[in-house]
């Protein structure tokens, strides 16, 4: 009885410690120590239970010894294990099972004991709990044992591991591996097995067929220079989503689009079955005659469909033109002439002429116009075919810049509302006016004393001046010794030359100065000569200094 208890506790210890070792909780040294302590405790318990041998003997072959090591791991005795053959040198097999409800359950069976130098088996069984692929089983060989063989065959790695790969393991399927090892010395041989698997997910794809249809609506007739609008309707009448739906509408010959493009492209993206989209396209007719607008729809993997509408463009109803100077100087009046005509064969009614001036423009005169801020308005009840009228507007700009005069004419006729527009742009130039002032700071002075000539250069005009140059010449009584200014300079004898100033802005002032020493008595003179791109003739200014 004592031997039986000791064996049972030994099985419990080895099973539990092996489970913890396999899960990575214990290291080898700790596992061996734990096993020794548990076996010693088993000997003590066996002595205490001697008095109950007879009662326990009857239940000897039916008792299950189960010990919970961790919440996920359970060690059980395999009651159906086959007795070892007489020529084998290992005991009955017992099983360690990982109760894992995820992908793959792994079961490992090893003998209760083995003989040093004689091989014993390690059985590993992987059970699929769901469909998995790329199942990898790794077996850590015992530290003090020699690998003999395995089924399926494999080769140990450098760190003493055996690795098997199962391409696919279905739910409920089993895969068994047997490893034979030979212990090399006495002690506990610990072995660990791990499994890694990828769940296999199967999906169903519903296939359908998109069917994109396109229709177009537009007027049968229109007037020249009056907007013509088309409606393009796109609908998916199929059973699947149409991907990357694109509508292309080339601008027909005789039409113009506000964007200036010759091909209009509309990206509709994906369209679900039954989904409908509407695109509105507006053109301006440029000539009379029949014009056909064609819209083409395409989508990923499908055929292109087209829809077209033909429109007859009638004679023009109204025309407007505006003329004015291309450029002028600031504050100088400029006259614009606005011409409105009816080149068609229909009477125009309720004609409105609107002239919109750019900000910065001031109206000097506009006969017959209603003036509101920067807008001028003329109205006519009728404009007969072939009739033409002119309106004159006198304006001026207060600041330099480019300003545009926009004219729009709106009218009604039997063919609908007719409009026409025109514009004229005038560049208003400023005028540079560069002046110079020369003064000396000390006058009179004694021989040996210094004085400073200051030269202020100012652009009083409305435009910038460029390449502004300054030269100073002094009589023999004054000797230049230093200078300062916005540009570099050089002293040569009694002359100081400053480098050209690239730009002098409107209303801008710069100052030059030259320090001079009185070298002899007399009535000295200093002459400043100023030149620039706008000064056709250089400007000079003279200052005198008395020296005694």
Curated annotation (Swiss-Prot):
GO terms for biological process: regulation of cell shape. InterPro entries: Chlam_OMP6, Chlamydia_OmcB, DUF11_rpt, Ig-like_fold, OmcB-like_DUF11. GO terms for cellular component: periplasmic space. It is found in: Periplasm. The keyword tRNA-binding does not apply. Residues 45-65 are annotated as: Disordered. Residues 54-63 have a biased composition (Basic residues). Keywords: Cell shape, Disulfide bond, Periplasm, Signal. One of its GO terms (molecular function) is extracellular matrix structural constituent. Its main location: periplasm. It comes from the Bacteria. Residues 23-40 form a propeptide. Residues 1-22 form the signal peptide. Part of a disulfide cross-linked outer membrane complex (COMC) composed of the major outer membrane porin (MOMP), the small cysteine-rich protein (OmcA) and the large cysteine-rich periplasmic protein (OmcB). In elementary bodies (EBs, the infectious stage, which is able to survive outside the host cell) provides the structural integrity of the outer envelope through disulfide cross-links with the small cysteine-rich protein and the major outer membrane porin. It has been described in publications as the Sarkosyl-insoluble COMC (Chlamydia outer membrane complex), and serves as the functional equivalent of peptidoglycan. It is present but the disulfide bonds are reduced in reticulate bodies (RBs). PANTHER family: LARGE CYSTEINE-RICH PERIPLASMIC PROTEIN OMCB. This is Large cysteine-rich periplasmic protein OmcB. The lineage of its organism: Bacteria, Pseudomonadati, Chlamydiota, Chlamydiia, Chlamydiales. The gene is omcB.
């Amino acid at each position: 009885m004592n031997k039986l208890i000791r064996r049972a506790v030994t099985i419990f210890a080895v099973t539990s410690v092996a489970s913890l070792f396999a899960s990575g909780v214990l290291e080898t040294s700790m596992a061996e120590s734990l096993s020794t302590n548990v076996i010693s405790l088993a000997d003590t318990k066996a002595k205490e239970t001697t008095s109950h041998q007879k009662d326990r003997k009857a239940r000897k072959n039916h008792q299950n010894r189960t010990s919970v090591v961790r919440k996920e791991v359970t060690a059980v005795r395999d009651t159906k294990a086959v007795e070892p053959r007489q020529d084998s040198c290992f005991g009955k097999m017992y099983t360690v099972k990982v109760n894992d409800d995820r992908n793959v359950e792994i079961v490992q069976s090893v003998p209760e004991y083995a003989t040093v130098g004689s091989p014993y088996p390690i059985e590993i069984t992987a059970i699929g709990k769901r469909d998995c692929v790329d199942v990898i089983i790794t077996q850590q060989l015992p530290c003090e044992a020699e690998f003999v063989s395995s089924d399926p065959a494999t080769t140990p790695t450098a760190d003493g591991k055996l690795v098997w790969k199962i391409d696919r393991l279905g739910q409920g399927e089993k895969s068994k591996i047997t490893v034979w090892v030979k212990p090399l010395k006495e002690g506990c041989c610990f072995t660990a097995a791990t499994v890694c698997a990828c769940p296999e997910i199967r999906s169903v794809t519903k296939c359908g067929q998109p069917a994109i249809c396109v229709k177009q609506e537009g007027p049968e007739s229109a007037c020249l220079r009056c907007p013509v609008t088309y409606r393009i309707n796109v609908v998916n009448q199929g059973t699947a989503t149409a991907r990357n739906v694109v509508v292309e509408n080339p601008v027909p010959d005789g039409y113009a689009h506000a964007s200036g493009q010759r091909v209009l492209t509309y990206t509709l993206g994906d369209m679900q079955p039954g989904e409908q989209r509407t695109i509105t396209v507006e053109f301006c007719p440029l000539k009379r005659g029949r014009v056909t607008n064609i819209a083409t729809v395409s989508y990923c993997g499908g055929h292109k469909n087209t829809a077209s509408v033909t429109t007859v463009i009638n004679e023009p109803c109204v025309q407007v033109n505006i003329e004015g100077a291309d450029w002028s100087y600031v504050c100088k009046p400029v006259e614009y002439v606005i011409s409105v005509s009816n080149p068609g064969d229909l009477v125009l009614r309720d004609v409105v002429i609107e002239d919109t001036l750019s900000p910065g423009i001031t109206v000097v005169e506009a006969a017959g116009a209603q003036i509101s801020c920067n807008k001028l308005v003329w109205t006519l009840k009728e404009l007969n075919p072939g009739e033409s009228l002119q309106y004159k507007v006198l304006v001026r700009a207060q600041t330099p810049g480019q300003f545009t005069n926009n004219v729009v004419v709106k009218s009604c006729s039997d063919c609908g509302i007719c409009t026409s527009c025109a514009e004229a742009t005038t560049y208003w130039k400023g005028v540079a006016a560069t002046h110079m002032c020369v003064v000396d700071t000390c006058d009179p002075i004694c021989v040996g004393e210094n004085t400073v000539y200051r030269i202020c250069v100012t652009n009083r005009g409305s435009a910038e001046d460029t390449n502004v140059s300054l030269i100073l010449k002094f009589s023999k009584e004054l000797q230049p010794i230093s200078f300062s200014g916005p540009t570099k300079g050089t002293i040569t004898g009694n002359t100081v030359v400053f480098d050209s100033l690239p730009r002098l802005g409107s209303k801008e002032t710069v100052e030059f100065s030259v320090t001079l020493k009185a070298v002899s008595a007399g009535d000295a003179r200093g002459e400043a000569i100023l030149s620039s791109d706008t000064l056709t003739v250089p400007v000079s200014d003279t200052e005198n200094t008395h020296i005694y």
